[in-house]
Amino acid sequence: MSHNMKGQKKRLAKAHKQNTRVPVWVIVKTNRKVVSHPRRRHWRRRSLDVK
């Protein structure tokens, strides 16, 4: 990670932040119609297209 460019690190950080679960209040508000996150990514199963 030490030789990465700042832009790439920034994009990796954004991907890291986006990779979170659906908030509990959303699940409660939608009466459990929304429980899964379609863009959720597992580090071993799906790779990132970071340039």
From Swiss-Prot:
Keywords: Ribonucleoprotein, Ribosomal protein
Pfam families: Ribosomal_L39
The keyword tRNA processing is assigned to this record: no
Top-level taxon in the UniProt lineage: Archaea
BP GO annotations: translation
Keyword Cell inner membrane part of the UniProt annotation: no
GO molecular function, one term: structural constituent of ribosome
Name assigned to this protein: Large ribosomal subunit protein eL39
Protein family (similarity comment): Belongs to the eukaryotic ribosomal protein eL39 family.
GO cellular component, one term: cytosolic large ribosomal subunit
